[in-house]
Swiss-Prot record:
GTP 2 binds at residues 184-191, 231-235, 296-299. Gene3D superfamilies: 3.30.300.20, P-loop containing nucleotide triphosphate hydrolases. Residues 353-437 form the KH-like domain. GTPase that plays an essential role in the late steps of ribosome biogenesis. The gene is der. CDD domains: EngA1 (cd01894), EngA2 (cd01895). The lineage of its organism: Bacteria, Pseudomonadati, Planctomycetota, Planctomycetia, Pirellulales. It comes from Rhodopirellula baltica (strain DSM 10527 / NCIMB 13988 / SH1). This is GTPase Der.
């Protein structure tokens, strides 16, 4: 039995996205007074007393989209309604019953799943009585809530759970999914890629740049591996960020990178890299995320152009990420899409790898023998030992006589050596140089300690 789905529907600006965030207890959807902010279906998993359901946020019914995507938005809403086990019909107590509310109810005619009429913005108890006029709609159990004043959240959750399909004893929490952030400039094919992965029209795909405004999570499975793909808003030059939505989108893309286990950095095979690409790659590096450079739309490139040309170009543009794998795909047809995801799973495994202190020091000793550190103030700095202290990213602490004596170039050399000889070949490695403690120094003077180059 699949995880039950609960869809949030209603006219624009009744607080659907606020309700979504409130029930999820975290800010996932963009909340703004501008009509039509939500276009794609957003989902999150909710748990209550061992009962799981997937909550779906949808666009406002009846809004005319400024980018001529109205029919696509409607299709996304219809798909959410069709897949839902329970429907939350959201109305606004403060504005009262509107003709568009009645149109929404008309759209639900013939839908046989349970409907819960959620009267939002009842910020004070005395406003609850104003919700009675919505009973004229004749659909579902009526409950008043306020997302801003945190009124009746638990009651609403219980009403939802009571109307879910009878629980299957075999239904367990979905296994932890590997999170993949899909980032890049606008219109490079990120949403098409997600649709290919999910094998459904999950995202609105259009030639209108900036179609995806939220970061949207899509769960799917490949060869027994569960993934959670996060499709992010496309970024553009900072001086071009003209609206609050673009500001939110930039923030969403950055947060998606922070959430991710692996990042897929998308490029358009027909366009050169830009300042935006470099800023985004810099953000990925800053957060030490494993990354695959994905060159999309490869089918549109002249067949005589070798992939090596793009490889050389990207290596030149992003010299500090020379270890990052590069993939060439056609998201629209699915060419190499599965291979990219399998490679992402390999990177995730590398980032989770842990090596013993003995093996790490054996590798480090070989690096020092091959290339000892340079003299510093008349002395050669000593490296005593190293230990891996964490994963994701693999993090190594090197105990030495003086961290200042080991230059950044030498530290990069050690990282490169570890990458070549340990199971961290294609992922970032964090390296910390730390001065030995007084007790360790005393042990060395007494003959009980030794450096790796001894």
């Amino acid at each position: 039995m699949p995880v039950p789905q609960v869809a949030i529907v209603g006219r624009p600006n009744v607080g659907k996205s606020s309700l979504f965030n409130w029930l999820a207890r975290r800010r996932l959807a963009i909340v703004d007074n501008f009509e039509g902010v939500t276009r794609d279906r957003m989902t999150t998993l909710i748990e209550s007393d061992d009962q799981f359901f997937e909550l779906i946020d949808t666009g406002g019914m009846g809004v005319e989209d400024a980018d001529d995507l109205t029919s696509d938005v409607r299709r996304q809403i219809d798909m959410a309604i069709a897949s839902a086990d329970v429907i939350l019909l959201v109305v606004d107590v403060q504005t009262g019953l509107m003709p568009l509310d009645e149109e929404v109810v008309e759209r639900l005619r013939g839908v046989e799943r349970p409907v819960i009429l959620v009267a939002n913005k009842a910020d004070q108890e005395h406003q609850d009585i104003h919700a009675d006029e919505f009973r004229r709609l004749g659909r579902g159990h009526l409950i008043t809530v306020s997302t801003t004043q945190n009124r009746h959240r638990d009651d609403l959750i219980q009403v939802i759970v009571d109307r879910l399909p009878e629980k299957d004893e075999d239904l367990v929490a979905p296994e932890s999914s590997m999170k993949i952030a899909i980032v890049g400039r606008r219109n490079v094919g990120k949403s098409t890629f997600v649709n290919t992965l999910a094998e459904s029209d999950r995202m609105i795909v259009s030639e209108v740049a900036g179609t995806t405004r939220d970061s949207v999570d899509v769960r799917f499975e490949i060869d027994g591996q569960t993934f959670l793909a996060i499709d992010t808003p496309g970024l553009r030059k900072r001086k071009s960020i003209r609206t609050d939505l673009d500001f939110y989108g930039t923030h969403r893309a950055q947060r998606s990178v922070r959430r991710a286990d692996v990042v897929l950095m998308f490029f358009d095979a027909l366009e050169k890299t830009s300042k935006v690409d470099k800023q985004l790659v810099g953000y990925i590096m800053e957060h030490h995320k494993p990354v695959i450079f994905v060159v999309n739309k490869w089918d549109k490139v002249d067949k005589e152009v070798p992939t090596e040309r793009w490889v050389k170009y990207l290596r030149h543009q992003f010299t500090t990420l020379s270890y990052a794998p590069i993939a060439f795909i056609t998201g629209q047809t699915g060419r190499n899409v599965k291979a990219v995801m399998n490679h992402a799973a390999m990177l995730y495994k590398q980032a989770q790898s842990r090596v013993s202190t003995g093996e790490l020091n054996r590798i480090l000793r070989a690096a020092i023998e091959q290339h000892p550190p340079a003299m510093y103030q008349g002395r050669r700095p000593k490296i005593f030992y190293a230990t891996q202290v964490s994963t994701e990213p693999p993090t190594v602490v090197v105990m030495c006589s003086d961290p200042k004596a080991l230059t950044h170039d030498y530290q990069r050399y050690l990282i490169g050596w570890m990458r070549d000889h340990l199971p961290f070949g294609e992922v970032p490695i964090k390296l910390y140089m730390q001065q030995r403690s007084r007790s360790e120094a005393k042990a060395e003077r007494s003959g009980q300690g030794r450096s790796l180059e001894s």
